[in-house]
Structure formats: structure tokens, C-alpha cells
């Protein structure tokens, strides 16, 4: 068998490495190495959201992993939801270490606008009531106000997990932690350049039944920045790795085969 690839799975806001528990063994059974990491203040990471100021602070575990790779080692990055923003930072700093960056129903930044652009567009195009019982709370200081975000049970059930099993929803409900979109940081920054971020091959996986980041917005992002390839998982809600793990695995195996 051909040498297996190394997949690095990057979870979305309020989630952790645990969200990949169905996908990880499938990729490993196909001969690949899989790292499903916890970002800062996520999963079992001991930091609290109140300790984080910037997207970079939040992304640190991914940056440390990329830094630790040997000079000739390359990975396939998979970012889910807000995890697409973390991918952006890794692509900018380590483009030579990435075979491809896979955006799974994710926010996908561009190198033209401010780093907050796609999140601002999402907020403009998505009615505020779509957030349901998600809590947005201030933290930080008066000089540096920040906002945390915590998904409520209704938002999880109706916008993210509506096609998942009751067990997966129960698991998520017990494990989600407060997170942030880091809008205050991103709106002041231009983290992504065409020369570095833009040089990495991008694959977008569209989830057709997603009510969190709707298909229409996923496709708008693809049109906004362009991708090497777009793949569709029909019948997947926002949590494709839980409701359609076999289909997602098949798509990722195809990507592993194709991007060398």
C-alpha cells in the first residue's frame, strides 16, 4: 500500500477534538495517521476562553503541531466550521507543509479583505434569530472588549445536529465549551496573503443540509475566493463527521490520493 498521509483535524467553535470520534478510526483503518487536536480553551485544553485575546492565541495548539513537523513532513489540514479560520493561519505560516487545506462546511477567509470579512458577510446574510439560544457575552477589559460565544441546546439541536443521532447531540451538549469568533481581533487584521495562504491548494466540502452555515453561504464563499476543488456531501447537516462519517471519509480518502 502507498504511504499513508497525515490528516490534522481542526474542530469548530465550542467543540473539541472529540467531534471527530467517528471519522478518526475510519481514516486510520485506511492506513492514514490522524491527529484530532484540541484548540486553546477547547475540549480537554486547560485554558479558559477568558485567557484568549486573538485568533492566534486560539490557534496555538495547531501552530505548535505544524512547527513540530519534520522539514519534509506534509499534512492534509481539515477545518470544520470556524476551524477554517484556524486553517488560514496555518496556511499563511506553513504553506510548504500542507498538501491541501480542506474546508468542511467552514468559514474560508480570503487574502483580499480584512480577516473578519467572511464572518461579517455571514452575519449580514444570516438573520440574528438564526442564533437561537446562543449566548454572546462580553469579556476582556474596557480598553480591549472581547466577546465569547456559547451554543445553546436549541441551536445545537436545530441548526447543527438536526440530522445526527440523539446520542451525538447528548454527547455534544455535555462537552461544548464557550468559544469566540474573535471579531475584535480579525476586524483589525489582514492575516492572509496571496503569496503564502493563497499558494495552498484549497478543497471545499459542501454540506447540503447545513442550517448553521447554510449551503448558499458555503457556495458564496467558494465563489468569493475560488478553490482547487469543491465536493458535495448530500444529506449532511453541519456535523458531517457525525451524521455522514462514511461519506466524509470517502471524500477525504479521494483527496489523500489526489493531492501529493
Swiss-Prot record:
Salicylate binds at residues 13, 81, 159, 238, 253, 257. Keywords: Hydrolase, Immunity, Innate immunity, Plant defense. Pathway: Plant hormone biosynthesis. Esterase activity is down-regulated by salicylic acid (SA) or by tetraFA, a synthetic SA analog. Changing residue 81 to A: Abolishes methyl salicylate esterase activity. It holds the Pfam family Abhydrolase_6. It is an enzyme of class 3 (hydrolase). SUPFAM superfamilies: alpha/beta-Hydrolases (SSF53474). It comes from Nicotiana tabacum. Belongs to the AB hydrolase superfamily. Methylesterase family. GO terms for molecular function: lipase activity; methyl indole-3-acetate esterase activity; methyl jasmonate esterase activity; methyl salicylate esterase activity. One of its GO terms (biological process) is innate immune response. This is Salicylic acid-binding protein 2. It catalyses: methyl salicylate + H2O = salicylate + methanol + H(+). PROSITE patterns: LIPASE_SER (PS00120). Its EC number is 3.1.1.-. The active site is at 81 (acyl-ester intermediate), 210 (charge relay system), 238 (charge relay system).
Amino acid at each position: 500500500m502507498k504511504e499513508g498521509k497525515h490528516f490534522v483535524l481542526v474542530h469548530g467553535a465550542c467543540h473539541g477534538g472529540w467531534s471527530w470520534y467517528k471519522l478518526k478510526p475510519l481514516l486510520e483503518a485506511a492506513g492514514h495517521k490522524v491527529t484530532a487536536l484540541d484548540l486553546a480553551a477547547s475540549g480537554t485544553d486547560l485554558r479558559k476562553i477568558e485567557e484568549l485575546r486573538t485568533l492566534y492565541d486560539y490557534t496555538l495548539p495547531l501552530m505548535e503541531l505544524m512547527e513540530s513537523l519534520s522539514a519534509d513532513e506534509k499534512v492534509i489540514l481539515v477545518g470544520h466550521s470556524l476551524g477554517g479560520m484556524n486553517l488560514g493561519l496555518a496556511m499563511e505560516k506553513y504553506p510548504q507543509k500542507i498538501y491541501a487545506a480542506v474546508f468542511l462546511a467552514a468559514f474560508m477567509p480570503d487574502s483580499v479583505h480584512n480577516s473578519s470579512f467572511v464572518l461579517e458577510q455571514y452575519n449580514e446574510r444570516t438573520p440574528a434569530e438564526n442564533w437561537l439560544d446562543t449566548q454572546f457575552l462580553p469579556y476582556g477589559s474596557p480598553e480591549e472588549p472581547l466577546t465569547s460565544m456559547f451554543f445553546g441546546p436549541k441551536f445545537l439541536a436545530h441548526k447543527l445536529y438536526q440530522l445526527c443521532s440523539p446520542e451525538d447531540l447528548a454527547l455534544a451538549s455535555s462537552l461544548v465549551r464557550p468559544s469566540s469568533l474573535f471579531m475584535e481581533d480579525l476586524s483589525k487584521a489582514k492575516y492572509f496573503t496571496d503569496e503564502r495562504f493563497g499558494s495552498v491548494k484549497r478543497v471545499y466540502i459542501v454540506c447540503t443540509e447545513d442550517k448553521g452555515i447554510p449551503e448558499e453561504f458555503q457556495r458564496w464563499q467558494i465563489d468569493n475566493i475560488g478553490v482547487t476543488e469543491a465536493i458535495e456531501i448530500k444529506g449532511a447537516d453541519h456535523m458531517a463527521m457525525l451524521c455522514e462519517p462514511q461519506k466524509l471519509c470517502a471524500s477525504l480518502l479521494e483527496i489523500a490520493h489526489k493531492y501529493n
